């Protein structure tokens, strides 16, 4: 069946080449037109399904507590005398607290408040927060911390002292060193964070002339959005740069521009059609899908290079190009089909992961591989068959020149292949032992792998985002956020149930029914306040003594239930928050925590003496309720609802972390789990995590588990395919040998050198599987074919280290060196992909050429019997 299909395709390609050109051009133009619809997505939230429990809860928490994604603008004041070491000199350093510095901060704050997309009422800065003090008559006093920029040092010192008295601001809004201040900028849409950050940078650049101030902007939203902007630019640079490098390398090998144009057309058409289809079908371009072009480029030219290599060797002047190319493609069809199917299977296995962007990446790369195979099978024969005799003559003069005039590249390639041949055929036993040792060490290295990621680390160390992240996390408690949400899950009796169960005299039955109707009215709402008002109204009526007493008892029980239902106004429960914070304050990974207890302590202090001795929690529910009621008379009453819900049954503890590494967040989660294991929450209280730092841990855990399942599944699928396609169990095992060694070595090296296992590295396993098996299939298929012709094992290997080994080496070099431009990328994931792509290609080719001959010789009784 395959023979008939390939014959028809080759007839169409060589006889109706213009049809092939027209069809390919139409597909490319149509898909290229779809790219105008591109949407960039760098939100790590989308690494989880929209209905994933952790993501749903995180978004519920943001809505419930009015928490918004925020940009952090930080400013650091250079010390007045960097070389000063004596105490007197240091004491004169006011740091950020000078009139000029505070005026600059106020100016930037006012600009931020007027920036489109900023939630102005929630901006936190010296200019927008309250100073909580005790008035002259002992009353609680709320005044703006910095209603206007100070004009004297005395006023600046007052602000410094005021902030030092407010633990909720110290370490968050101002550093304990007095050298830095922060502005927290909540935004309506995290996708606007880069634009807002750029507006702020532009204002600072144009309006702040104070050279002693260093301004920084960071935060996960701006890091993610800025990565998206730079990723878009990188997409436009990396793929063409890689294509250019591949083009140059192909010319070095084939010395014919006309000939090597063909594989480049295949690669570019594959990339454009695949990316156009992805965008046209409505998928966003995530960090992974942005690399589709980079991954497809090498795979798309692999088959073309094999065809060109064999065509160049077979074609002689005077022969018909269409006949030669037909023979070549028929000869290579089976190994090319096998490699395409197995490579596609490797990437399709990524669809088994629970990470949507990785699923999309795997689906489109797998489809792109099959598309490249189809284009290669039709376009390359059409192209070569239409080459002019003059162009083919030039090809021959370049490739079949006399040995004395051979090009340097041929000499180097032949020397390399000859060296590999010598090693492979003369040191079989030593090679097998060496690779066994390397594999054993690599397995140990795999167990040393540290799973970790951090979107900020996607930038190079000298990038402004990384510089800002390092500087601000050194000065402040932390720019990374996580939330512990504690909730009372006990079901409360409704107001209607309380009324129904109340012991009332029969004379109040009619009143009870009327009140129940009111409570059941959807407009009135079923709540205790409505019931309390109804009882109050009834008490003012003309009542008998038993009616009056019964209603009074009901009102008392309502008041009692209202008090006890407000879980986080109960002293023990608020103390629970304080105890948790005290524990976390002893952990180096946690910079600072804030909760409802901090609000209560500050207000309680100022309601009493104003001294630190009264910075404590009241010991009764009414006293706590009073402090919270007083706080709501501040300029920012909405801040209370960032920490507790209006019914006081759900509360939030805000953790500030100085590290956004998933590894560190995982350790914090374990610390809290251990704490609650030793300090059990009261019955009915439960806790859950939310926040960006936590979500990153969740999706990475999913990714690791998913990638392991994907890799194992793909390995089994490819092995079964190899056995079926090669029709031999022993050849199936041999085909998997280079793949297994390469994957083991690559990931072992990652563990040994201490490179974090992150998202780009995780998906490279699929590429390793696809490309490693490619070389092995070509080697085994050609070895079987040559053995059938020669009947001699030694002659088979001698022939294998001629054109087949040269083709494998040429392919490996083209792909490995073709991606060196990625090493110059400003974004770390692209650098990672470049390094590992090159390593995978080099190692898999080397293992194929060294290990397979040794293994085949060792097992020759079975291998060549089946051949």
Question: Could you describe each region identified by the protein language model?
Answer:
Residues 235-237, 264, 316-353, 707, ...:
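Pore- and gate-forming transmembrane helices of large, multi-pass membrane proteins
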Residues 149-256, 570-579, 583-589, 593, ...:
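Extracytoplasmic
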Residues 22, 280, 297-309, 333-352, ...:
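Transmembrane alpha-helices and their membrane-interface boundaries in multi-pass membrane transporters
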Residues 419-618:
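Juxtamembrane segments of multi-pass membrane proteins
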Residues 83-92, 100-174, 188, 193-196, ...:
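Alpha-helical transmembrane helix bundles of large polytopic membrane transport and channel proteins
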Residues 232-285, 352-356, 708-754, 758, ...:
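Interfacial segments of transmembrane alpha-helices in multi-pass membrane proteins
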Residues 2-243:
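Membrane-proximal extracytoplasmic
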Residues 1-42, 381-382, 386, 397-454, ...:
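Signature of alpha-helical transmembrane segments and their immediate interfacial
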């Amino acid at each position: 069946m395959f023979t008939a299909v390939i014959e028809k395709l080759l007839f169409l390609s060589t006889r109706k080449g213009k049809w092939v050109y027209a069809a390919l051009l139409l597909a490319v133009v149509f898909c290229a037109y779809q790219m105008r619809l591109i949407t960039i997505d760098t939100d790590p939230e989308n690494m989880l399904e929209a209905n994933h429990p952790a993501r749903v809860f995180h978004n519920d928490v943001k809505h419930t507590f009015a928490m918004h994604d925020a940009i952090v603008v930080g400013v650091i004041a250079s010390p007045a005398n960097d070389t000063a070491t004596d105490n007197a000199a240091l004491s004169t350093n006011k740091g950020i607290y000078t009139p000029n510095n505070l005026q600059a901060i106020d100016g930037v704050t006012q600009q931020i408040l007027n920036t489109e997309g900023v939630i102005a009422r929630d901006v936190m800065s010296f200019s927008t927060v309250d100073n909580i003090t005790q008035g002259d008559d002992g009353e609680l006093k709320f005044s703006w911390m910095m209603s206007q920029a100070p004009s004297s040092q005395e006023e600046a010192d007052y602000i410094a002292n005021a902030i030092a008295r407010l633990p909720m601001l110290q370490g968050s809004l101002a550093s304990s060193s007095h050298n830095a201040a922060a502005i927290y900028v909540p935004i309506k849409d995290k996708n606007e964070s880069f634009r807002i950050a750029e507006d702020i940078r532009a204002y600072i650049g144009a309006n702040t002339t104070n050279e002693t101030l260093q301004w920084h902007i960071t935060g996960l939203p701006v890091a993610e959005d800025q990565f998206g902007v730079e990723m878009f630019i990188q997409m436009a640079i990396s793929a063409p740069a890689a294509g250019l490098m591949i083009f140059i390398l192909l010319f070095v090998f084939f010395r014919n521009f006309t000939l090597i144009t063909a594989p480049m057309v295949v690669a570019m058409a594959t990339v454009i059609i695949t990316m156009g289809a992805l965008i046209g079908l409505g998928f966003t371009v995530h960090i992974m899908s942005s690399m589709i072009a980079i991954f497809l480029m090498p795979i798309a030219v692999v088959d073309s290079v094999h065809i060109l290599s064999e065509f160049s060797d077979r074609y002689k002047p005077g022969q018909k190009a269409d006949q030669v190319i037909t023979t070549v493609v028929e000869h290579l069809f089976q190994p090319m089909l096998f490699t395409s199917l197995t490579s596609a299977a490797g990437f399709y296995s990524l669809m088994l992961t629970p990470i949507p962007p990785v699923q999309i990446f795997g689906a489109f790369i797998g489809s792109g591989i099959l598309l490249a195979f189809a284009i290669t099978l039709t376009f390359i024969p059409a192209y070569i068959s239409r080459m002019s005799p003059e162009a083919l003559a030039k090809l021959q003069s370049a490739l079949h020149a006399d040995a004395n005039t051979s090009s340097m590249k041929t000499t180097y390639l032949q020397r390399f292949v000859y060296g590999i041949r010598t090693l492979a055929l003369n040191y079989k036993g030593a090679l097998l032992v060496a690779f066994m040792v390397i594999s054993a060490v690599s397995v140990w290295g795999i167990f040393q792998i540290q799973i970790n990621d951090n979107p900020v680390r996607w930038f190079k160390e000298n990038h402004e985002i990384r510089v800002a992240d390092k500087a601000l996390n050194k000065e402040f408690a932390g720019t990374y956020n996580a939330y512990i949400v504690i909730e009372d899950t006990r079901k409360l009796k409704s107001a209607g149930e309380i009324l129904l169960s109340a012991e009332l005299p029969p004379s109040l039955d009619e009143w009870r029914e009327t009140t129940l109707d009111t409570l059941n009215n959807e407009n009135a709402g079923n709540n205790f306040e409505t019931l309390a008002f109804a009882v109050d109204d009834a008490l003012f009526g003309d009542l008998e003594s038993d009616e009056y007493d019964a209603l009074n008892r009901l009102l008392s029980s309502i008041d009692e239930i209202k008090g006890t239902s407000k879980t986080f106004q109960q002293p023990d429960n608020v103390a629970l928050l304080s105890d948790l914070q005290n524990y976390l304050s002893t952990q180096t990974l946690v910079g600072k925590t804030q909760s409802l207890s901090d609000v209560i302590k500050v207000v309680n202090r100022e309601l009493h003496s104003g001294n630190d001795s009264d910075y404590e929690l009241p010991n009764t529910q009414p006293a706590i309720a009073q402090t919270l009621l007083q706080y709501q008379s501040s300029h920012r009453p909405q801040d209370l609802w960032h920490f507790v819900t209006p019914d006081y049954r759900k509360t939030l503890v805000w953790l500030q972390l100085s590290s956004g590494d998933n590894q560190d967040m995982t350790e914090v989660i374990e610390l809290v789990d251990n704490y609650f294991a030793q300090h059990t929450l009261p019955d009915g209280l439960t806790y859950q995590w939310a926040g960006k730092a936590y979500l990153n841990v969740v999706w990475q855990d999913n990714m690791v588990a998913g990638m392991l399942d994907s890799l194992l599944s793909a390995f089994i699928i490819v092995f079964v395919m190899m056995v079926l396609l090669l029709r031999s169990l022993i050849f199936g095992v041999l085909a998997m040998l280079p793949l297994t060694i390469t994957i083991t070595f690559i990931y072992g090296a990652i563990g040994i050198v201490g490179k974090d296992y992150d998202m780009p590295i995780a998906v490279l396993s699929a590429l390793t599987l696809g490309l490693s098996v490619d070389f092995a299939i070509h080697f085994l298929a050609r070895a079987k074919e040559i053995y059938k012709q020669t009947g001699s094992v030694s002659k088979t290997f001698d022939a294998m280290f001629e054109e087949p080994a040269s083709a494998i080496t040429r392919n490996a070099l083209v792909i490995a060196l073709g991606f060196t431009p990625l090493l110059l990328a400003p974004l770390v994931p692209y650098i990672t992909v470049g390094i590992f792509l090159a390593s995978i290609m080099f190692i898999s080719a080397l293992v194929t050429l060294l290990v397979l001959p040794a293994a085949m010789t060792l097992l020759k009784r079975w291998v060549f019997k089946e051949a």
